[in-house]
Amino acid sequence: MEKHIPVLLKESIEYLNIKENGIYVDCTLGRAGHSSEILKKLKDGKLFSIDQDETAILEGTEKLTKISNNFKILEGNFVNISAMLAMQGIFEVDGILYDLGVSSPQFDVAERGFSYRFDGPLDMRMDRANNSLTAHKIVNEYTQEELEQILWNYGDEKFARSIAKNIILSRPINTTFELVSVIKKSLPAKILKQQKHPAKKTFQALRIRVNNEMETLESSLEQSLNLLKPKGRVVVITFHSLEEKVVKNIFKKYTLDEQQFYLSNLPYEIESSKDFKLLFKKPLKPTNTEVENNNRSHSAKLWVIEKK
């Protein structure tokens, strides 16, 4: 199992602007890296951490209990953040964090089918109890056109047509390694020689489609903004352009008046009447030192929005 190092840890905790008696939500518990740092800063406050993976919940509980008891782990998908908090009697919070990096323990388990590094069944469901759509179903039942669209839209895969065509010709495809083999046959030799794994984009695309990730993120972010107290903040760490697009569009919607959309090139700022403001126009990126020490961080960006 690879060691998981939280990305942009110092910056994300700093921009959450944690008050020791505040209420905070970590929407992506994962390996509890960010949750641990939030919890250390709370005195009478409370942390709610969300995850739908049993292993993450067990490991997270063990890790956080060593720090303090001022936390509660909520099992489920962050698309239900409002309802989950309401069940705890919480209707407004001081800060919410999303680390959208793939970091859950389940990604290192071969039988979950997320990784092109391990051979396992083509599953990729985050929530196996409530989601019936698997990567196996998509790979073996969708049309070539549908597969192309998924690979292009969610993986930005230039060779989507070639991969989709070969998937159709190679059916049935039952395991991750069988799919990797088909992908490799579909790509030019020069691409196969590159450092990046040839299956990375296809696996990303399938995972996003199986778990409806972009629509889920969009819905959850909107709920989070409506949960904030005045001066409360939402901090998001993104890792690829699809996530960036969702965050950027929602943050724009909540911070810019209509006239600002059309007059954005003016040499002076127009004060927005909206209830939210961005802490910085362009997202923060990791330092060169962090990228050198943690390769996962090279594409990470930090976004922060505050309720006025």
Curated annotation (Swiss-Prot):
E.C. number: 2.1.1.199
Reaction equation(s) it catalyzes: cytidine(1402) in 16S rRNA + S-adenosyl-L-methionine = N(4)-methylcytidine(1402) in 16S rRNA + S-adenosyl-L-homocysteine + H(+)
InterPro entries: RsmH (IPR002903), SAM-dep_MeTrfase_MraW_recog (IPR023397), SAM-dependent_MTases_sf (IPR029063)
A single GO cellular-component term on record: cytoplasm
One GO term (biological process): rRNA base methylation
Pfam families membership: Methyltransf_5
SUPFAM superfamilies associated with the record: Putative methyltransferase TM0872, insert domain, S-adenosyl-L-methionine-dependent methyltransferases
Record: residues binding S-adenosyl-L-methionine: 32-34, 51, 78, 99, 106
Keywords: Cytoplasm, Methyltransferase, rRNA processing, S-adenosyl-L-methionine, Transferase
The keyword S-adenosyl-L-methionine is annotated on this UniProt entry: yes
Cellular localization per UniProt: Cytoplasm
GO molecular function: rRNA (cytosine-N4-)-methyltransferase activity
Function: Specifically methylates the N4 position of cytidine in position 1402 (C1402) of 16S rRNA.
Family: Belongs to the methyltransferase superfamily. RsmH family.
Protein name: Ribosomal RNA small subunit methyltransferase H
Gene label: rsmH
